[in-house]
Amino acid sequence: MKILVIADVEAKYYYDYYIPGKLDEFELILACGDLKKRYLEFIATMAHCPVLYVRGNHDDCLLVDPPGGCVCIENQIYEYKGIRILGLGGSYRYRSGKNMYTEKQMKNRIHRISYLLWKKKGIDILLTHAPAFGLNDMDGISHRGFECFFYLLE
């Protein structure tokens, strides 16, 4: 299965310079957060496959006005063609606001869905905005990863 993963930056290749059919090769599109509503709606309109997303730390507006044609999978396991995808958006808390979590809060989110994880017999893909701690995270607390993701992936 060919999956397109997008996050943070709107790729001009798929938007400003779009040519009809450019998204036809993908069977699934995963959006990892911090993408504008209009961009997600454009992708969903042009693609002939599901567009699943989680929110990033700059996506407060998507809580009240979600992008049409897309499926938010926050705290859910979405199954597509036998592939189980868990969505856990947000970043490490660095200020007050929505879609930001401490390590403890993210652990609690995982704990709240532990029955679902057991019932579905695990997951195949973890869709997040933040990385796991130490895996492609960056300096600065806003780009820090979550250690609890390792527990989840075991």
Segments the model singles out, each with a brief description of its role:
Residues 5-14, 55-148:
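Conserved catalytic scaffold of divalent metal-dependent phosphoesterases
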